[in-house]
Amino acid sequence: QARGLRVTIQKLDPYINVDPGTLNPYEHGECYVTDDGAETDLDLGHYERFLGIRTTQANNVTTGRIYSTVIDKERRGDYLGKTVQVIPHITDEIKTRILTLGQSGAYDVIITEIGGTVGDIESLPYVEAIRQLRLELGEGQSMVLHLTLLPYLKAAGELKTKPTQHSVKMMSENGVHPDIIVCRTEQPLSKEIKAKIALFCNVKIDAVIEAADAKSIYEVPLLMQQEQLDIICLKKLNITWYPEPDLTIWKGFLDKLYNPTSTVTIGLIGKYIELQDAYKSILEAFIHAGATNECKVEVVDIHSEFITADNVDEKLQGLDGLVERMGQKALPLGRYVGQKTVDGGLNGIRHQVKTRNK
């Protein structure tokens, strides 16, 4: 995108739920709602924050939605009485969903993330759809990037490449071979490790990318640029008409993020505070707002069920501000999140109103 290309990202989730709207936040994190009202995966929030774009229902597809669409078509008679099968009907619907964004003409590059793990039975139709799609699109029109983990054994002091070798082998057995392998790692990759992965996974050594742990997720694009991931991707896609990337604004954001001049403490009242992903967009908003104002935002998690009229002063002591997040559905709150949660949230709000009015 920094090179002037129009980019969007979509997420394919292998679970059978039609959308994440009814998933327990403890299991799946927050449900991210797009501008068109679609209830989607929380990753779409990351896509919007990183690219500065707006996503829609087309950016998030689940197995449940795929099957629902295919069954509806079968009930209408669209398949003319044919036996409906995973291949070709389910895989065709997956391919249609992948191609929809590209056919809009609004983008130069579509990044499609397939959730789950290679070898999961739920992921097999997606891998097969990718195999077919690569063949149909032709050479230079698509590429496959495989994200893998390199475990580090502290006792032995070495990185293990076997899991990566086996996952690539499993992908290849299903007809899909990665063009690029991105290795998540705690330790830097030596040339020997990269060469070993390249040899056993049948990719060029410059297509083995180190993705080391970063201080902030917003540092990752700069780390990927250092590994020349962008240049390799452009070559694989036969894209040659691009200017040099300008990441000045991005680097300025990171500089402010890492060098705050002040600190504020904000309380977050919620029901699912044990899992950070349950309130991911709120926490990321604090990061963005803090960096913009050169301020570090320290968030204090407060479980709404444990706030009472007797202890509210103690629970909210020393806070500069408060965000309250009780429920996520347009249902009677007491039924959805529990009356204790509602009462605790209201106690917190009343306390803040009184404090501000003094």
Regions found by a protein language model. Name each.
Residues Q1, Q317-Q328, P332-R335, Q339, ...:
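Cysteine-nucleophile active-site neighborhood
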Residues Q1-C295, S304-G321, G327:
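Flexible phosphate-sensing "switch/lid" loops adjacent to ATP/NTP-binding sites
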Residues M171, V342-G348:
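Compositionally biased, intrinsically disordered low-complexity regions used as flexible
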Residues V297-V299:
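Carboxylate/His-rich catalytic cores and anion/metal-binding grooves
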Residues Y336, G348-I349:
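Intrinsic low-complexity/disordered segments
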Residues R350-K354:
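Periodic, rod-like helical contexts
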